[in-house]
Amino acid sequence: MNRGYSESAMVMYVAADGETALTLRFCRFPDDGVTWLWCHVLDGDRLFGFTDHDLPCDGARAFDGPAAAYATVAPTALIERSGSDGAMTEARFSAGLLMAERAAGRHGPGDTRVSVNGVFTPRYSLGEAVAEGRREVVGALVGEIVLGGRRLRLEGLAKYHEQRQDTPRFIEPFRYLCLWGPTASCVAIASRAGQIGAAMLDGAESVVTRFVAPPIADARSVELGLRDGIGLRADVRTLKAISLPIGSETWRGSFVTATLGGHAVTGMLNEWQADRLPPPAS
């Protein structure tokens, strides 16, 4: 497990009809010389994935620059942010990977050649005061997936996430929900330190102070409490679950569709040792 400074970037897309989804994620550990690369593609009910936790990384730190590039050479993959962290203008991404068709993860290549590319254009940053060193941006994505010779068009709302931290990753339990749609979005994080996040409904943003979710299931009703005392419910349905080994434990994620306070949204719900989270305060 890598324990030094780290910085990550991630592009997430789930089509409004739930038929196509993509996530491309880098996590750089420049002090350790290691890059993690994750990529998952959903095509109907088929999930393809590639992960590797042992790719090289140079010693430069990307997050604070006037632009940032997260990249690997073999295999070839890239997320390139234009503009600084607080003033990004776009993020371009691409990857050419040999993926495996499976939901239960193991690291390394598969036997299906997949390429992805596209451009993410930001619309607004969600919850800028939520947590130091992390950026959650909702925007528009245009791109394509080429899977087994078939071209899948990507066009619609998406999410960009970038984060840096000095403390080790995947030590403390957490639950992470991110949802987005034309009229609503949210990000909510539960950890031992408490629950934080932000929700945007019809153009008005509120701070999330409570985040409660039942155990992993195909359908879950998630409770969000807002700072102004209003309760907000997200009814979440899993499109496809994903699991990955990290050390001796298992990270669990999922592409989802949902309603957020009655608004149609899509997104992801990811968990790490969630059964070890303390119950939220009443």
PLM features: what roles do these ranges have?
Residues 1-282:
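Structured soluble/peripheral alpha/beta segments that form catalytic or ligand/cofactor-binding pockets
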